[in-house]
Amino acid sequence: MSDLLSALLLGILEGLTEFLPISSTGHLLIAQHWLGARSDFFNIVIQAGAIVAVVLVFRQRLLQLATGFNQRGNREYVFKLGAAFLVTAVVGLVVRKAGWSLPETVSPVAWALIIGGVWMLLVEAYTARLPDRDQVTWTVAIGVGLAQVVAGVFPGTSRSASAIFLAMLLGLSRRAAAAEFVFLVGIPTMFAASAYTFLEMAKAGQLGSEDWADVGVAFLAAAITGFVVVKWLMGYIKSHRFTAFAIYRIALGAALLLWLPSGS
């Protein structure tokens, strides 16, 4: 398989999985197990491509927050988005400076998929008894920020799953409201991560080793696919639970543990 086709497939995979609660990083690690490993920069760029999709999908909401910033509700919502981002940025930077790196084997990803799937089922069962609430509290904002760090440390956890379900557990029980907040927090989070990685690689003189055609194709594929997925998901969760995604995670994790040789 050519490098360009591999990049295209990885971009599509990123767009499909970044916003579904099934772990994009986990799926990319699994895919790269067979398609060949890519650089951290490549992975961050395609994540940024997927975030472009969020900007496009929520462009009206973003415009509403910007033009209506003088309104108390909009202003507080923006401040809570900022708080979630700052928690992720500060704690994430500490973790990064500590030298934490992604696992090179698939087994930890498989276990994270299974544990995350069980966690989703338990939270769904608990929140089903609660009234629908769409108010983002400061506790929810801080929790979402921490959940994003956990997802970055443990691939297979899923940034969207950990953050959405913690938000639901902390009181933001309406799925669409929780997903919207998490996706909007993802905009500054992923763009900041992309910029940080770009600067680190530029200082190390590693950017010249990137195949920019591959990166560009993967970025566009992730953006286009991500746009379709986010539009679909926001409609889907208005009348459906996340149960199907939880079952998929558990099944995929179990299959990986059964089929892959020990140490893979």
Curated annotation (Swiss-Prot):
Topological type in the membrane: Multi-pass membrane protein
EC top class named in words: hydrolase
Chain segments annotated as coiled-coil in the UniProt record: none
A Pfam family reported for this protein in Swiss-Prot or TrEMBL: BacA
Transmembrane spans: 38-58, 75-95, 106-126, 136-156, 181-201, 217-237, 242-262
Main subcellular location: membrane
Reactions it catalyzes: di-trans,octa-cis-undecaprenyl diphosphate + H2O = di-trans,octa-cis-undecaprenyl phosphate + phosphate + H(+)
A GO molecular-function annotation: undecaprenyl-diphosphatase activity
GO cellular component, one term: plasma membrane
UniProt entry keywords in alphabetical sequence: Antibiotic resistance, Cell membrane, Cell shape, Cell wall biogenesis/degradation, Hydrolase, Membrane, Peptidoglycan synthesis, Transmembrane, Transmembrane helix
Cell compartments where the protein resides: Cell membrane
InterPro entries: UppP
Known EC number: 3.6.1.27
BP terms from Gene Ontology: cell wall organization; peptidoglycan biosynthetic process; regulation of cell shape; response to antibiotic
Family note: Belongs to the UppP family.
Additional remarks: Bacitracin is thought to be involved in the inhibition of peptidoglycan synthesis by sequestering undecaprenyl diphosphate, thereby reducing the pool of lipid carrier available.
PANTHER family cross-referenced by the UniProt entry: UNDECAPRENYL-DIPHOSPHATASE
Its biological purpose: Catalyzes the dephosphorylation of undecaprenyl diphosphate (UPP). Confers resistance to bacitracin.
Protein name, entry field: Undecaprenyl-diphosphatase
UniProt source species: Stenotrophomonas maltophilia (strain K279a)
